[in-house]
């Protein structure tokens, strides 16, 4: 089992110090958010809270994920970084491939790409993209980015992504994993079909056996059941070593936790409680060290 955490709602000035601490104490990965902007009003409910509300302050600072990752990569040696998730359907894949390859060069390939579908119609409308095409657009973008990262001249001709032979340099020295996020069947199917793994939203531990079975079924459907596949799970109520070992036995490869969160919180209330805590940088660093000493050490 590998361990990581997400830096959503963490002040930008704390990122490097937190990354250095996690790197020193044996964490595997850090995830960062992607949010180009937050509309004051949205026309659809947020899909991951019971009442559809957005749980974060709209003026919360969110760095561009590639900037945040680069800032942390230059002060660390080992830990990996993952945008989770990059809203790929609203982004231009040639430019995203360039950003990813550039960050990979700076980070010595300690980066993966986590992608997902943006959920706000306003994002698509104001960026001039037809939201109805987002699934197919993302499929093509994933395939095009994979090609571009291979090096040499590449071309791609899809309905939404279309370019003649181009070359991009530098390119990564090793394969950069692409993880697909989302809780819906189409998202999980996309992960099984095109991804090197799946990124979860927040789930409780009693949901996990059915989720893993569903992912494995889709992988068999696409003939990929024998390929390596990471499952990166965010499960706040997996609080004990025994809980985590049971998840590992189910096939979970990576557990995303919030080490400074309140132990035992339910998934649906976790984020709100974390916000109420407003932990200091020192509290976060102490929690990162404590979790590494008491939990991660059991899996080395």
Predicted regions and their residues:
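Active-site-adjacent structural elements that line small-molecule/cofactor binding pockets in enzymes
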Residues: 1-300
